[in-house]
């Protein structure tokens, strides 16, 4: 590589999450945030949509179109699809500018194995990166929150993602102790799906469950209860059904 090619390159930061992908361009900030979802034709294996467009297909696609999330619990479950998804998001973030291959820093959960780290690194190189640097999610979260991680004092970081929850104590620029739990946002969504089925005989999809969580989900009782109309399919009659749910009731979804 020549010095000119390197100067024409660009630095990217990617938060490769189970639920969503964020892309940061140095000097510009976060330029992209989209769901980690890919839709493809079951018969031809051709990708039909990636990101937000694919998310809208979750649970609502015709029989031959499948919408999948290529990462599960923070790690790659489908290497080829993940590679194509990263490449798509990188190209979308950079647009039609004539940058050479970018240098990419990409987040990984703190508890992943060396093999899982290698898979992320290789997928990012295959997607067109010139250099790849892996950074543990709690460290990235601390820096993003404005914490000076170089100081000789401990800061506990709790990063709840879609597939994993990372907890770490950071001091003097490094991780003192950390753990990664495979319980996170996706599990909350699944608990809401079970709860709606058990309480209302109502079948809802992942997308609806996530909307419920975002709009009225809470971990403690609110002074004023919030309500939301939820649409789904009646499991008894098979017909569309609408129910009204409250934020207080959702406190007990984990019991469903």
PLM region spans:
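Nucleotide/phosphate-binding catalytic cleft detector across ATP-hydrolyzing
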Residues: 1-160, 168-254
